[in-house]
């Protein structure tokens, strides 16, 4: 009898140890990214997000230079949305268009959002960052933030504050290269973006996640902390 008791107690303690060592269990999510090269570069944002949350499923539709209008007119994009396969659909507008052609941005975000909701998924807008080659056209961090915030309020959709995370990172470390001269992200920029989406979609701080992508350990820890700070985590 005593042997059975100790065997049972050992089993319970072992089970508790295994459970606690596994950490929090994240729900499985199916995520579709719709955008262009900003989402596609450095192996794809969907790929990096799965590095943070490997139990999920993700895919991207990202032809170069595409606007949301182009996606609306593309049967491949609409078929993917209407498949009903996704829990979350992320929309990324062409990096200048949200500011220089806001009404076009709004019109096609609204149309795509309606299809996404009809298919039973949630829309999340990908707030891009300031383009260094387009500030003369008004594509500044402040203007991009204002455009996406206004759209989010008008459509009642969530906006992932990637631009805010970029601004915060560069304020603390102006030496860190998050994008090249035409605005396309470096591996560090893509990694920071993935950190933001991981925290935003799963409501779980990226800090301490073992996935490091293609960045150094120092940059990994810094960018995870910045993303968490931008998300208030």
Give residue spans per PLM region.
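Serine-dependent acyl-ester chemistry module
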Residues: 88, 94-96, 100, 131-143
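C-terminal motif of bacterial Sec signal peptides marking the signal peptidase cleavage site
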Residues: 18-21
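A short helix->loop->beta-strand "cap" motif at the edges of active sites that frequently abuts
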Residues: 114-124, 157
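Conserved SGNH/GDSL esterase-like catalytic core that processes O-acyl groups on lipids
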Residues: 29-34, 38-110
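Bacterial lipoprotein signal-peptidase II cleavage site
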Residues: 23-29
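Bacterial N-terminal signal peptides that target proteins for export
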Residues: 1-9
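Catalytic His-Asp segment of secreted/periplasmic serine-dependent ester chemistry enzymes
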Residues: 138-233
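Structural beta-sheet core signal
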Residues: 33, 125-127
């Amino acid at each position: 009898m005593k042997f059975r008791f100790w065997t049972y107690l050992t089993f319970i303690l072992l089970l508790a140890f295994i459970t606690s060592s596994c950490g929090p269990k994240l729900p499985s999510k199916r995520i579709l990214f719709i955008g262009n090269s900003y989402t596609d570069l450095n192996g794809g944002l969907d790929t990096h997000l799965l590095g943070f949350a490997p139990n999920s499923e993700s895919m991207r539709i990202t032809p170069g230079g595409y606007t949301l209008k182009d996606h609306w007119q593309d049967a491949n994009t609409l078929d993917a949305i209407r498949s009903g396969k996704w829990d979350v659909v992320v929309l990324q507008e062409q990096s200048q268009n949200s500011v220089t052609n806001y009404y076009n941005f709004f019109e096609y975000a609204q149309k795509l959002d309606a299809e996404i909701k009809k298919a039973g998924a949630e829309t999340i807008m990908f707030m891009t960052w300031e383009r260094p080659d387009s500030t003369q056209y008004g594509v500044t961090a402040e203007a991009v933030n204002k455009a996406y915030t206004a759209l989010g309020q008008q459509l009642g959709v969530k906006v992932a504050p990637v631009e805010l995370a970029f601004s915060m990172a560069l304020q603390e470390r102006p030496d860190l290269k998050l994008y090249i001269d035409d605005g396309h992200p470096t591996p560090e920029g893509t990694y920071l973006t993935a950190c933001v989406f991981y925290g935003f979609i799963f409501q779980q701080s990226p800090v301490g996640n073992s996935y490091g992508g293609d960045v150094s350990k120092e940059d990994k820890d810094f960018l995870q902390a910045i993303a968490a700070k931008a998300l208030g985590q």
